[in-house]
Amino acid sequence: MTVTSTIHVVAALIRDQAGRVLLVRKRGTAAFMQPGGKRDAGEDDVTALAREIDEELGCRMVSGSARPLGEFEAVAANEPGRRVKAAVYGIDVNGEIAPQAEIDEMIWVDPLAPPNIVLAPLTRDHVLPLAAADQA
């Protein structure tokens, strides 16, 4: 299959007190990934990320907490034939984190020892190794 286009998204690396990373699985999909999504018209990365965190997790991104971690590209997990390019930010959140909207499930994983679950290529190949290197 030929990869035809790239989807541009923002993604959040959220850690708990133990250093575990939050992953979510969207309804009707198999792969776990970072919370986040596509920018709406006129949004910058941080505004889009704050909106996505509110929509997906029901909590608020702490103002000024977004730390750019890099841009990464991989095969898209949920859109066959496409790639995803993500601007990844480490963020802090306020409030209780709970699946909302299209999120079916969320888990906290140790980036040094991720569980045997289906991971989005971007998460598996870039984000968890980045988080593990930062934690080691």
Regions found by a protein language model. Name each.
Residues 72-98:
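Active-site-adjacent beta-strand/loop module that shapes the phosphate/pyrophosphate-binding cleft
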Residues 1-21, 38:
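Conserved N-terminal beta-strand and adjoining loop/helix that marks the start
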Residues 88-90, 98-132:
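NUDIX/MutT-family hydrolases
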Residues 35-69:
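The catalytic Nudix box helix
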Residues 7, 34, 63, 67, ...:
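Short connector loops at helix/strand junctions that flank enzyme active sites
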Residues 29-30:
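A short acidic/small-residue loop/turn micro-motif
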